[in-house]
Amino acid sequence: MKCPSCQHNGTRVLDSRPVDDGKSIRRRRECESCHYRFTTFEKVEETPLIVVKKEGVREEFSREKMLRGLIKACEKRPVSLKTLEDMCFDIEKELRNQGCSEVKSELVGEMVMDRLAKIDEVAYVRFASVYRQFKDINVFIDELKDLIKKER
């Protein structure tokens, strides 16, 4: 690796340690020529996961976007941010483990709703009402009936 100070091509690693829950490695380096010390970070470059929307539009998967939707659905509910972050992480991990570079938004939405129904039913209904675009109260009632059936 080139030294940022003198541009010499030889550096040695003084210290390495995992950071960001093991997703990255922090390395302390020293230039063999000028002895300048600097830090580098190394992490795996992930293949982007593409979400295909209902209209056919493609966009890169965003765990942050999914988390924002969940936070909105769980507003004023006894669901911790950690629980929601873990859910988002698990969903992303499951999607990536499928080995596909593209996933349908419907699959992502169903995965969110399956998990949310087990965590908080009110948040589930809130999320489902936006995700499934309930047109009237009857659709809302049908969803509640389905939820009650699943409980029994």
Curated annotation (Swiss-Prot):
GO biological process: negative regulation of DNA-templated transcription
Disruption phenotype: Suppresses the synthetic lethality of a dnaA1-yabA deletion for growth on rich medium, increased levels of nucleotides in the cell, increased levels of DNA replication elongation.
Domain spans labelled ATP-cone: 49-139
Cofactor note: Binds 1 zinc ion.
Recorded coiled-coil stretches: none
Transmembrane regions: none
Zinc finger (unnamed): 3-34
Family of this protein: Belongs to the NrdR family.
Protein's recorded name: Transcriptional repressor NrdR
